[in-house]
Amino acid sequence: MIRTVDGRRIGYDDSGGTGTPIVLLHGFPLDRTVWDEQAGALAGRRVVRVDLRGCGESEPSDGPALMELLAGDVAALLDQLGIERAAVVGHSIGGYVTLAFFRMFAERVAGLALIASHVAADAAGGAAAGASVTQRTLAAGRDALALDLERTGTMEPAIASYLPRYLAPAFYAERPELVERLRAVMACQDARGCAQLIRGMQVRVGGEDLLADVRVPALVVAGAQDTYLDPKTLRAVANAMGAVYVRLENVGHLPMFEAPRATGDALAAFAQRVG
């Protein structure tokens, strides 16, 4: 489905159903189809899956895709769908958007879930005072990737950078058909739009100050073999906001692909708590 939201095309799916709506926000550089395997676990619920700018069927951003802009897109789409309040679930960058949505529209959040997503800022692209050498190095790499995406006009630079690291080693080696499926999802995204998503992530505001304000059902899912995030850090995030913490063994940065049933079960239990 496609709607025009504030003059911009936004891709989404709306399952219909009962209960508090569940909004699913995908990671980078992916789209709303990454949640396909969780549809069964959430059957009967109203589930809205959204494509972020530059991904799937959504138009790319004209400038840096700030998390606040993306959260505003979600809010405007929910307005059009007649949804006043929803539980928001975000994977990776989708988690950043989830936190931005909570900061901007806390009264509309009935539940909050972070899937392989952290809350700390990226030190303003590594240029902020106090940024570590590691942060600066990572930021420089992301800056270069954004430029490569714009220069080539293809997703190949992002695929080469992210695909091998997103999955647990055993999964990457033993499930070639799913690796190719993931590659295909990445390949069909808008390269220039994804460059703007990178720039938006670089300057995002951290969400540590929000955690104590979470008074709704919350969930944090971590992959034990995630090379981007330390599960211990995500456990601390869960503790800080009183969330249920689910650690998935032999899983990397993509629980929806690597452990679809366990991820679906976690989301179903979360949805039940939301009501």
What role is predicted for each listed range?
Residues D213-V251, F257:
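Conserved loop-alpha-helix segment in the C-terminal half of the alpha/beta-hydrolase fold
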